[in-house]
């Protein structure tokens, strides 16, 4: 068994990073060799065997994410493989899980609860609407579809994924996009209808006579009432992550040092921009898992991004801000653009409008802004 470096790597380490090292050992000895190290993809695993880099592939976290990986590869069900994202949020950091969770997986909450959570056919099929095609909505949809319900997902955008799709934009997090692809494959398998570019309204939902409605409309960015917030050179983090706005060789100020703020700054920095991040907190990306956070901050430092903490933004000027630090007012100037990353709030307007229809449920960020592991967990529990 050949391992190398840190035993459990985050998404900042390339998939299959250890394969070439394993091959060097295999070429030098005459006993079977097992290789390991972020091998989470069927093509990667099969190619490692085919080119004789190893005799066996060890699937660690990938087996937690999808215990059926080998059989799915054998049966050609590649599009149904749940891919480990390297997030570490339920497999490694297991101190505060709901319902006594031990080791499990962010995108597969069934992992570790196989004997407790079982998808059984419903005694009576229902007509169910799900509003929102993010991870929570799609997870609930395919489970309900598998139970035999008639499920329709309404997604206002042309593609599914919501905020989760934007989270997959940074290069090292692109495996997140595979989660949405797999959930959609499950939806297709279990006859879930997904209607894109369709805004669900109270009138539409009432007309369709659904037995139950699940609101999974996600979150909206927090926009504080700061003077200058509407300036023409002020953008939201989502504008950057969706590539609606791209900066090159500019000086950019990011307001907010949560995970979204720092990752947005990282993306901007990778395009050759000079970036500064400001936040009133005393710690950057405080809610991020320990090792990915460490990797993120190391990369941000390598990019020359400056993070200014304990600094409260008071006003946005044409080329910077006025902020308060240690009781003193200070200024930052000379910036071409300012990006807002002040966090998220529930997008619950539709829920408030339709809750009187009866049998209406709300999950994920639409209930309380949080993260994907919370949203997917809530969706799974409700659908069961």
What does each of the following model-derived ranges do?
Residues 5-11, 55, 165-172, 280-285, ...:
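Short beta-alpha connecting loops at secondary-structure transitions
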Residues 37, 180, 196-199, 217, ...:
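Short loop/edge segments at beta-strand edges and connector loops
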Residues 1-131, 135, 139-146, 151, ...:
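Flavin-dependent oxidoreductase catalytic cores
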Residues 122-153, 195-209, 217-230, 238-290, ...:
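Rossmann-like dinucleotide/flavin-binding elements
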Residues 27-28, 50, 146, 189, ...:
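Residues at the C-terminal ends
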Residues 24, 47-48, 72, 186, ...:
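Well-formed, non-transmembrane alpha-helical positions, independent of function
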Residues 15, 45-58, 206-216, 332-337:
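Short, electropositive alpha-helical surface patch
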Residues 150-190, 267-311:
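Rossmann-like dinucleotide-binding cores of NAD(P)H-dependent redox enzymes
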């Amino acid at each position: 068994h050949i391992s190398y470096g840190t035993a459990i790597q985050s998404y900042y380490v390339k998939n299959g990073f250890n394969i070439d090292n394993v091959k060097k050992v295999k070429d030098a000895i005459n006993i079977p060799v097992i290789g390991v190290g972020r091998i989470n993809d069927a093509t990667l695993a099969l190619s490692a065997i085919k080119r004789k880099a190893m005799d066996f592939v060890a699937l660690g976290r990938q087996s937690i994410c999808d215990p059926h990986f080998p059989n799915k590869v054998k049966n050609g069900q590649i599009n149904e493989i749940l891919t480990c994202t390297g997030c570490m949020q339920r497999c490694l950091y297991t101190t505060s899980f709901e319902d006594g969770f031990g080791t499990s997986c962010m995108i597969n909450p069934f992992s570790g609860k196989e004997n407790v959570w079982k998808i059984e056919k419903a005694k009576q099929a229902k007509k169910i609407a799900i509003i929102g095609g993010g991870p929570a909505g799609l997870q609930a949809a395919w489970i309900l579809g598998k139970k035999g319900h008639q499920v329709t997902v309404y997604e206002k955008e042309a593609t599914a994924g919501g905020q989760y799709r934007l989270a997959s934009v940074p290069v090292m997090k692109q495996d997140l996009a595979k989660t949405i692809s797999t959930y959609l494959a499950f939806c297709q398998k279990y006859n879930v209808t997904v209607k894109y570019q369709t805004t669900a309204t109270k009138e539409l939902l009432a007309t369709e006579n659904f037995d139950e409605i699940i609101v999974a409309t996600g979150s909206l960015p927090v926009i504080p009432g700061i003077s200058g917030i509407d300036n023409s050179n002020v953008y939201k983090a989502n504008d950057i992550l969706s590539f609606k706005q791209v900066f090159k060789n500019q000086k950019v100020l990011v307001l907010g040092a949560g995970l979204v703020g720092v990752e947005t700054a990282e993306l901007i920095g990778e395009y050759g921009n000079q970036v500064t991040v400001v936040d009133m907190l005393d710690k950057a990306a405080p809610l991020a898992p320990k090792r990915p956070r460490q990797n993120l901050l190391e990369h941000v430092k390598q990019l020359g991004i400056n993070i200014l903490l304990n600094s409260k933004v008071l006003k946005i000027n044409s080329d910077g801000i006025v902020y308060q630090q240690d009781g003193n007012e200070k200024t930052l100037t000379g910036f071409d653009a300012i990006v807002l990353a002040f966090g998220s709030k529930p997008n619950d307007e539709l829920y408030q409008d339709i809750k009187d229809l009866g049998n209406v449920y709300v999950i994920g960020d639409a209930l309380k802004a949080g993260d994907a592991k919370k949203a997917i967990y809530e969706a799974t529990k409700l659908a069961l």
